[in-house]
Curated annotation (Swiss-Prot):
Ranges of biased composition (kind: Polar residues): 30-49
First-tier enzyme category under EC: transferase
Keyword Oxidoreductase: no
Gene name for this UniProt entry: SHMT2
Listed name of the protein: Serine hydroxymethyltransferase, mitochondrial
Length: 504
């Protein structure tokens, strides 16, 4: 019986990491000698990772090779530039700096003050924001802490919020809870009510959202998604917020790069607060940003007195000291690098290509008879509903993983199981960073379709998900088909360049 092995030792090594692997073998063969040498000399801190920890170095090589030979379709992933990675792996990791520029609790912060202020300026410039009307906090460690900081700043415990339901394409931090448990910290500390998609169109049901808001009276409504392929009507959501006197938070984590490039509408005209991650379509290091309105909010018609926004101090206090300690200065620097890149014509071209590639992928899937939630895409992703095909996202994800295509299972409207949801989420940003074009994505869909068909055949022969996964590895004919498909996928993928470092 032929077993379909996924172990690294069974994989041929090509391109990414070949020379380094040779060095690793030499290091392993001389491990005893190296250890003896290390014992005889003092630690300098200048030892390379490959010298001081060959085991970890090899794991990095394996991951680098996986990325080079695979097709990365997870919509929330991208490939960071070498320049940003250099900042991320710099001496800035050494500096602790609780507080804000000019108001630190530690000395020696004059340089990191400049770095943080530079990141703030670039963040405002990237989204064409007037610093008199908008401010930004660049210290959140990622998107989820950024959202929690906003809730902490604007709400009291048990205040009410509304966000898109997770099975309909929302995010955990927008208040998700199941029938039996409050899943997200947002739903634990606050009272949440989801809004949903129209089941017929797959679009956000703004009319129902408005009706629900009138009854629920939320203090905060979140305009943001994690698996929604269409544009958000921020103006409509602003109307709802004004009617019920709620704040509007736009979570643009998935689409911030597209917003910066001006290829899709911006939420800043309508939102009170905007949060984002920095590693998705923005293509930076993993971190978070919180933008907030400042300046004059309104003028009292009776007294003529200017009424200012009060977000700045509340948000800054929520980030530090309420929720975080010292900022990750290395990440802030790397984000600043990415924000500079986001202001270039080249980044706009990249973002336009992301949209073209996503649409090409959607069209190719539709041509092959696949059902897409909402029927297509206006942004960087598509959500495939596999239920009409007779398959689920968990089985499709596993088959594709075995042939070096990385995607993720995802709930579709009406799904009741997060373990075997009906959807498969596919994104264009990462492969577009590897210079894929429309025809390349049509080829990718060919590979996906072949994998799904294998999955359908195996599903007809197995019962439970675990049986399905076991059959993929142990059935000789299936293993051979998967191995053949994987070889073609990897040969195709390796022909494209990879951003970042060559070796890791």
């Amino acid at each position: 019986m032929l077993y379909f092995s996924l172990f690294w030792a069974a994989r041929p090594l090509q391109r990414c990491g070949q020379l380094v692997r040779m060095a690793i073998r030499a290091q392993h063969s001389n491990a005893a000698q190296t250890q003896t040498g290390e014992a005889n000399r003092g630690w300098t801190g200048q030892e390379s990772l490959s010298d001081s920890d060959p085991e970890m170095w090899e794991l990095l090589q394996r991951e680098k090779d996986r990325q080079c030979r695979g097709l990365e379709l997870i919509a929330s992933e991208n490939f960071c530039s070498r320049a940003a990675l250099e900042a991320l792996g710099s001496c800035l990791n050494n500096k602790y700096s609780e507080g804000y520029p000019g108001k630190r609790y530690y000395g020696g912060a004059e340089v990191v003050d400049e770095i943080e202020l530079l990141c703030q300026r670039r963040a405002l410039e990237a989204f064409d924001l007037d610093p008199a009307q908008w401010g930004v906090n660049v210290q959140p460690y990622s998107g989820s802490p950024a959202n929690l900081a906003v809730y902490t700043a604007l709400l009291q415990p048990h205040d009410r919020i509304m966000g898109l339901d997770l099975p309909d394409g929302g995010h955990l931090t927008h208040g998700y809870m199941s029938d039996v448990k409050r899943i997200s910290a947002t739903s634990i500390f606050f009272e949440s009510m989801p809004y949903k998609l129209n089941p017929k169109t797959g679009l956000i049901d703004y009319n129902q959202l408005a009706l629900t808001a009138r009854l629920f009276r939320p203090r905060l409504i979140i305009a943001g998604t994690s698996a929604y392929a269409r544009l958000i009507d921020y103006a409509r959501m602003r109307e709802v917020c004004d009617e019920v006197k709620a704040h509007l938070l736009a979570d643009m984590a998935h689409i911030s790069g597209l917003v910066a490039a001006k290829v899709i509408p911006s939420p800043f005209k309508h939102a009170d607060i905007v949060t984002t991650t920095t590693h998705k379509t923005l293509r930076g290091a993993r971190s978070g940003l919180i933008f907030y309105r400042k300046g004059v909010k309104a003028v009292d018609p009776k007294t003529g007195r200017e009424i200012p926004y009060t977000f700045e101090d509340r948000i800054n206090f929520a980030v530090f000291p309420s929720l975080q300690g010292g900022p990750h200065n290395h990440a802030i620097a790397a984000v600043a690098v990415a924000l500079k890149q986001a202001c270039t014509p080249m980044f706009r071209e990249y973002s336009l290509q992301v949209l073209k590639n996503a649409r090409a992928m959607a069209d190719a899937l539709l041509e092959r008879g696949y059902s897409l939630v909402s029927g297509g895409t206006d942004n960087h992703l598509v959500l495939v509903d596999l239920r009409p095909k007779g398959l689920d996202g968990a089985r499709a994800e596993r088959v594709l993983e075995l042939v070096s295509i990385t995607a993720n299972k995802n709930t579709c409207p009406g799904d009741r199981s997060a373990i075997t949801p009906g959807g498969l989420r596919l994104g264009a940003p990462a492969l577009t960073s590897r210079q894929f074009r429309e025809d390349d994505f049509r080829r990718v869909v060919d590979f996906i379709d072949e994998g799904v068909n294998i999955g359908l055949e195996v599903k007809s022969k197995t019962a439970k998900l675990q049986d399905f996964k076991s059959f993929l590895l142990k059935d000789s004919e299936t293993s051979q088909r998967l191995a053949n498909l994987r070889q073609r996928v990897e040969q195709f993928a390796r022909a494209f360049p990879m951003p970042g470092f060559d070796e890791h």
